């Protein structure tokens, strides 16, 4: 019996998870990536408990944890006074999940280990230098036009998953509006080999509230597993790209986190725009959007990639139910019914709230925000409730309740 074929556009972590999950469900899979290799620039790393459960289902959890850092705690700080406001402990979730912690594993590691596993399947094809330029469909199939090193071709399948990022070719080809807005400031990410835990009493994940310049500070393992720290700052609206990335600006920002007598050792610097946008549709016929192709958000809280992985797992489970006769095609609409409102409620609202909390300028409102965090952290019931939301466990359970 001929297997149903799933075409996945985009070999970032969401596309790779979608492709691997599809192969494991018995689909024929082709994964298309425009670039010559997985993008290994510093990007998302924070992986929440709800997502760890899914990576466990893929059979990758052991390697995933080994290549990252386990982060049980996260902290909020008042940057102007260098005061720790409170600490949250994921161990309070031990009765809710087998993974009561976050794992800091860079996203390219997940993509690479997923591709390695995918290549073990005889009916899975991974193609780099394969840029999707157009898509079309009829009642029985979907076809993607691909430009590669050796020219162009048309590839057909039963379903197509567009996981090709915020500038998604698939989304644009379907003329799907990307509702929302772009923040006026950008984010600059500075990676340093200096160990902040040796400098002051922080943990692996830290959020610094500051009316002038908030900071996210977190540790990742690095490819050599020796550890390095990333600091994320907002730019000033009037700063040019050249000014933001210049050595004097880079070192001034890092020295502003904690002054050192010598310059920081900077391993990488990156600058990007941030958005809050959600596609008005996640499905058109046999074509689906997931990950950044469907939704983008600011990085505070580390929710975007996690939600994208949830998209991929939800979608593949739904496709499998349909092709195996457990449900008819009408079930495919459930993917959008679940994933779009969940993203709006748990990712868009939360990341906007996180940003406003860190950047608040009005003194009374700012103090009230910090006091509220202390109260939540000090109350075991509210502490756990807060973690259920930040860990995305609550979002997964709510999604499952949507019929």
PLM-predicted stretches and their roles:
Residues 2, 150-159:
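Core beta-strand elements of the Rossmann-like FAD/NAD(P) dinucleotide-binding domain
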Residues 23-43:
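Glycine-rich FAD pyrophosphate-binding loop
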Residues 43, 48-117, 347:
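Active-site-adjacent segment of FAD-dependent monooxygenases/related oxidoreductases
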Residues 128-142:
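A conserved short coil-to-beta-strand element within the FAD-binding core of flavoproteins
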